[in-house]
């Protein structure tokens, strides 16, 4: 039986589910960019790509060399194809305008070019997260300048989302709104090949992922829930739990997607003005879309992540996602 490549899968989606051809081409271009990023990541010290740039991004985070390299790869791969009206990235203050010499398309691409990049120097899995939105009609004119407002759409408006994880294997996880598929990079073929047909998050779990060093800063509902997890079979939940924390959202969510679990990055008291650490547009929204399409759930403790109307491009949000029953439990604690 012949293997199904990403290209074949997308063509079949165009035939059977009316996936627009432009969206198909866009996903293929993003996948090619991820292959190039994977190549740079795998070189490590041999490629001279480790270490920091000595600069900061809009979030005030130190930029790693690979952050900037990955960002440039995604921009250069996608700007000329005619599928996009604009792009936005964790590494850029403002929306990226498609140069006037290239045709504009109907979609917007939002991405975190290298999530978990603080782990690069210690050889821990990192990844690229992306989200695709339709561009509002008023910005589709070739001469119309794109601004931040075009991107400020709730996660329910995403037409596709995915991430590439650069680990022992390079994988691409993708949803077009009809389930979640996993593709593994076959380096001999140079193609992503379908290896995970219908990914589902188990409804219950015995694992959770959270940075326990921040426990003293959490709000009471999170303190209560994690306390119950730690109490194990002698506590109210009557079973033992294991904690896993990689400090790379892609790596933590990928584990939860494949074997169940709960990922939490809650609001804490150190910066009361900030509702969370993770960015809504290019981290929480695409990951929440993927998790929901796999049968899981995602909230900020009170509301469904995908229903939140963004107010700014780099807006932060608290995130609780994963196995549905556990997400519903901790969300209920917030509402008591």
UniProtKB/Swiss-Prot annotation:
**Which Gene Ontology BP annotations are present?**
fructose 1,6-bisphosphate metabolic process; fructose 6-phosphate metabolic process; fructose metabolic process; gluconeogenesis; sucrose biosynthetic process
Residues engaged in binding substrate: 115-118, 211, 277
Q: What is its EC number?
A: 3.1.3.11
**Cross-referenced PANTHER family:** FRUCTOSE-1,6-BISPHOSPHATASE-RELATED, SEDOHEPTULOSE-1,7-BISPHOSPHATASE, CHLOROPLASTIC
Catalytic function, reaction form? beta-D-fructose 1,6-bisphosphate + H2O = beta-D-fructose 6-phosphate + phosphate
Protein name in UniProt: Fructose-1,6-bisphosphatase class 1
Cofactor binding comment, as recorded: Binds 2 magnesium ions per subunit.
Q: Which GO terms describe its cellular component?
A: cytosol
The compartments listed are: Cytoplasm
- Extract the InterPro entries matched here: FBPase_C_dom, FBPase_class-1, FBPase_N, FBPtase
Q: Where does Mg(2+) 1 bind?
A: 90, 112, 114
According to its UniProt entry, this protein's organism is Pseudomonas putida (strain GB-1)
